[in-house]
């Protein structure tokens, strides 16, 4: 009787699990279950190491250089990401040169605003004793923005407008255009330990208004590589431009440091959650 009771209880337990869970893989007498209503958070940086992932929903919204530093450089552990939200009156208007098949370059009106800053991993340094260490930092467009020299020059005009009129700046100076990514050096005296060098990246949103551009997105992306223009909502196309900020800093290694954000996940999130960084309307 006891064996029959145990068998019935076991079957009832399995039935309950199958009501709440689904089998996602099975083999070698092992079943891997997943809750039927399970929905991974889109805002997670990645799903590899849940404990060290920062939820984008918890990111702060800032509008100044100091606020970026406060939440990323000065905080322990630092937030790996913040939204940047400027009033619509601060948006910079510019002209973007886009190449069209059989038409050549055309000037397209765009509005530009910084929309986020994220902490980028640069390199790790094990330090023995107390030394003045020469370390790396990056300047220019990050290596995720690969485009033609004409497009980079056109994009740079809008960026320079933001640099001269907003309280969020890159800290670097350029002559005519923002350069492709370059490695620079800087030094800091460090005590013995394991250190990680990080540097913030500013992400700028370039907004093309007008639903009339929607049919041409594929063509614009084909002949203007690197922009990855996407159509969002009914009235605008957007592409994002990442530019390194001159603020490399070191952190002594600690287990509770957040993982760096994954750029592709970040860009998708920014596109789908414009209310986090876009005030709406035009200047």
UniProtKB/Swiss-Prot annotation:
UniProt keywords, alphabetically: Cytoplasm
Compartments, as annotated in UniProt: Cytoplasm
Gene Ontology biological-process entries: DNA damage response; glucose 6-phosphate metabolic process; glucose homeostasis; positive regulation of aggregate size involved in sorocarp development; regulation of protein secretion; signal transduction
A Pfam family per the record: BB_PF
GO annotation, cellular component aspect: cytosol; phagocytic vesicle
PANTHER family: MONALYSIN BETA BARREL PORE-FORMING DOMAIN-CONTAINING PROTEIN-RELATED (PTHR35884:SF1), SMALL AGGREGATE FORMATION PROTEIN (PTHR35884)
Functional summary from the UniProt entry: Knockout of the gene for this protein causes small aggregate formation. May regulate the secretion or processing of a secreted factor that regulates aggregate size.
Name under which the protein is recorded: Small aggregate formation protein
The species this protein was found in: Dictyostelium discoideum
Taxonomic path: Eukaryota, Amoebozoa, Evosea, Eumycetozoa, Dictyostelia
């Amino acid at each position: 009787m006891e064996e029959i009771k145990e068998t019935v209880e076991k079957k009832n337990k399995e039935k309950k699990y199958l009501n709440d869970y689904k089998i996602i893989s099975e083999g070698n007498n092992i079943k891997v279950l997943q809750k039927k209503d399970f929905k991974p958070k889109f805002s997670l940086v990645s799903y590899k190491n849940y404990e060290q992932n920062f939820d984008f929903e918890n990111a702060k919204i800032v509008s100044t250089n100091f606020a970026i530093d406060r939440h990323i450089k000065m905080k322990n552990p630092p937030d790996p990401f913040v939204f940047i939200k400027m009033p619509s009156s601060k948006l910079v208007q510019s002209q973007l040169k886009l190449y069209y098949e059989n038409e050549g370059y055309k000037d397209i009106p765009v509005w530009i605003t910084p929309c986020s800053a994220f902490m980028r991993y640069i390199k790790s340094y094990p330090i023995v004793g107390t030394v003045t260490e020469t370390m790396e930092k990056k300047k220019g467009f990050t290596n995720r923005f690969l485009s033609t020299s004409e497009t980079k020059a056109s994009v740079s005009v809008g960026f320079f407008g933001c640099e001269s009129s907003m309280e969020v700046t890159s800290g670097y100076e350029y002559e005519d255009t923002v350069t492709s990514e370059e490695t620079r050096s800087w030094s800091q005296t460090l005590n013995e330990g394991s250190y990680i060098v990080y540097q913030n990246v500013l992400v700028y949103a370039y907004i093309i208004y007008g639903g009339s551009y929607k049919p041409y997105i594929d063509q614009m992306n084909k002949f203007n590589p690197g922009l990855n223009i996407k159509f969002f909502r009914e009235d605008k196309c957007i592409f994002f431009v990442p530019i390194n900020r001159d603020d490399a800093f070191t952190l002594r290694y600690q287990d509770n440091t957040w993982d760096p954000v994954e750029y592709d996940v970040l860009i998708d999130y920014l596109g789908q959650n414009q209310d986090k960084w876009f005030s709406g309307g035009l200047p």
